[in-house]
Amino acid sequence: YIKFLVYASSAGVFGQKDHYYPFPETHYGAYKLAVEGVARAYFNEAGISSVGIRPYVIYGPGREVGGTAGVTLACKAAKQGNSYTVNFSGKAGFVYVQDVVNLVKMSISQIPSGALTFNINGITTDVSHFINLIKKNIPLASIGIKGNPLSIVDEIRGNEPSNIFKKFKYTSLEDGIKRTIDFY
């Protein structure tokens, strides 16, 4: 039977009101928060421990689908000499995909007790700065931004994975963007 589970929640559990406490303002965020409640119930009723991961904007090799995949697609387009427009603006937390993989591996190897959730904010910056870092690697890149900021606070705080997993660290934007460009 199942003794431990790692699952993907989302920074979408946060709305635009609070950096620390979930207050979803979309059906997607409300659903993800409900799943976290189900995980707590399974721990309380059946002793099944879990780790829920709430990533903000994941970018990197393979992240090519979803509403926030635009920054990865911008890296790919720049490398291939194509123009691209990222479909959201403003500040957000950017998480390199390997950081999420590393957290899953740490969770599986240490199997903490309880129904834990971790906010995976990554590095907070403006989308325009992310684009400038792409252009630092590929000066002739034709990348634009069009769209509104995400419907989540610009930075999620608290419940850091490093509180439990001492070796957990975020990849710098410079390194993550370079690795993403190199992949394509």
Language-model segments: residues:
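Short-chain dehydrogenase/reductase
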Residues: 24-36, 64, 68-69, 93-94
